[in-house]
């Protein structure tokens, strides 16, 4: 069956549970962009309340810190009501997807975009696909990407790999992302830490 599966609640990882990082990068606000990845009502609706609450709270803490520190903020959001051509192979794995109505498409209220934030239309797993995210980052002289949102092993991880492939240092915030299961979440963290990113917690970013 295609689409988002039923999700059972699980605890978000703590700093002690993170995989070891191979990279030793340091986050610098003047170099960074925060990517709020697909935090739309449609994608958060399947999350159990305890998981949703922790995810949104940590993402909101990140966003507030980024505003204070001068970190550029970017959002991805699917347009909804895609045509067959626009949907492409996505429909074979995820079905028709969301509608274009605000009930599906809006970013959740706690993370509402501000007037200076970049709004990117999301067409495939990677935030960089058919968007000008890379061009905007290059023009702004920013070469670090902090990632939060859903789903960890799908769009979040692929966007992380794409950033790395473009020599942008990704920082994957382990307790500000969520997934279909704890096992999927762990898989994304282990791959990122060993292959393409720094895996950190919200508290570590805010230190």
Curated annotation (Swiss-Prot):
GO-annotated biological processes = phenazine biosynthetic process
List the EC numbers from the record. 3.3.2.15
Which residues participate in substrate binding? Answer: 78, 87, 122, 151-155
Q: Name one Pfam family in it.
A: Isochorismatase
The UniProt entry, under InterPro entries, shows:
Isochorismatase, Isochorismatase-like_dom, Isochorismatase-like_hydrls, Isochorismatase-like_sf
Which pathway does UniProt place it in? Antibiotic biosynthesis; phenazine biosynthesis
**What chemistry does it catalyse, as a reaction equation?**
(2S)-2-amino-4-deoxychorismate + H2O = (5S,6S)-6-amino-5-hydroxycyclohexa-1,3-diene-1-carboxyate + pyruvate
Induction comment from the UniProt entry of this chain: In liquid cultures (aerobic), phz2 operon is induced by quinolone signal via 2-heptyl-3-hydroxy-4-quinolone (PQS). In biofilm (microaerobic), phz2 operon is induced by quinolone signal via 4-hydroxy-2-heptylquinoline (HHQ), a precursor of PQS.
The UniProt entry annotates the active site at: 38
EC category: hydrolase
For this UniProt record, the keywords arranged alphabetically read as follows: Antibiotic biosynthesis, Hydrolase, Virulence
- Could you tell me the superkingdom of the organism this chain comes from? Bacteria
* Record GO terms (molecular function): isochorismatase activity
Similarity annotation? Belongs to the isochorismatase family.
Describe the function of this protein. Answer: Involved in the biosynthesis of the antibiotic phenazine, a nitrogen-containing heterocyclic molecule having important roles in virulence, competition and biological control. PhzD2 (operon phzA2B2C2E2F2G2) has a role in the biosynthesis of the phenazine during both planktonic growth and biofilm development, and in host infection during biofilm development. Catalyzes the hydrolysis of the vinyl ether functional group of 2-amino-2-deoxyisochorismate (ADIC), yielding pyruvate and trans-2,3-dihydro-3-hydroxyanthranilic acid (DHHA).
The UniProt subunit note reads as follows: Homodimer.
Protein's name in the database: Phenazine biosynthesis protein PhzD2
* Record organism: Pseudomonas aeruginosa (strain ATCC 15692 / DSM 22644 / CIP 104116 / JCM 14847 / LMG 12228 / 1C / PRS 101 / PAO1)
């Amino acid at each position: 069956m295609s689409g988002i599966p039923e999700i059972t609640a699980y605890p978000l990882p703590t700093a002690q549970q993170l995989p070891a990082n191979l990279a030793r990068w340091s986050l610098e606000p003047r170099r960074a962009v925060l990517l709020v990845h697909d935090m739309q009502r449609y994608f958060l609706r399947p999350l159990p309340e305890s998981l949703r609450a922790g995810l949104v709270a940590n993402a909101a803490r990140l966003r507030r810190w980024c505003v204070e520190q001068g970190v550029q903020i970017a959002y991805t959001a699917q347009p909804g009501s895609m045509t067959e051509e626009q949907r492409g192979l996505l429909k074979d794995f995820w079905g028709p997807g969301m509608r274009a109505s605000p009930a599906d498409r809006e970013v959740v209220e706690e993370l509402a975009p501000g007037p200076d934030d970049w709004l990117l239309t999301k067409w495939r797993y990677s935030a960089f696909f058919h968007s000008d995210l890379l061009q905007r980052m290059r023009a702004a002289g920013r070469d670090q990407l902090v990632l939060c949102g859903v789903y960890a092993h799908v769009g979040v991880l692929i966007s992380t790999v794409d950033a790395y492939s473009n020599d942008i240092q990704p920082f994957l915030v382990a307790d500000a992302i969520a997934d279909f299961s704890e096992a999927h979440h762990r898989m994304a963290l282990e791959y990122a830490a060993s292959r393409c990113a720094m895996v950190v917690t919200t508290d570590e970013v805010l230190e």
